[in-house]
Amino acid sequence: MIERTIKNILISQPEPTDLLKNQYKALSSKYEVEFTFYKFFDVVGISNREFRDAKISLLDHSAVIFTSKLSVDNYFRLAKELRLTIPETMKYFCITETVANYMQNYVQYRKRKIFYGKLTFKDLVEVIAKHKEEKYIIPCAEDSSIDYFTLLDNAKIKYTKAV
């Protein structure tokens, strides 16, 4: 049997900021391999001009559904560019607790204001179903999973898809 040695490993994510203090440095020295970091895709938020052309108002909605940290960043970046003040009464629904904790960068974390599912979008829809009176906006990519919207439709949730 032929034994091959691996000398290079391609990591499909951005390079860590501090290479000396992360797990890749330890692996590199232990197994004598070199790590190459390459970001295969880059998600870019839309401009405020494109958002205005879509004729969606952030303030017409009483709740937001976040499926990633990137959607949180883009939502609040867009609100800032449009010079909108997000009301204190706005409710936030996050797919995981990690995304909910990330919200602390933008809003004060309150249990009555930020809700999250266990792990999947189906778990989150169960939480959302308890707040059917809200009007939701869901910031998402153009190629977002259709399953999200099917689950929301089946639960009879009023939402606007903001691409």
Model-found features: residue ranges?
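Conserved beta-alpha
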Residues: M1-V163
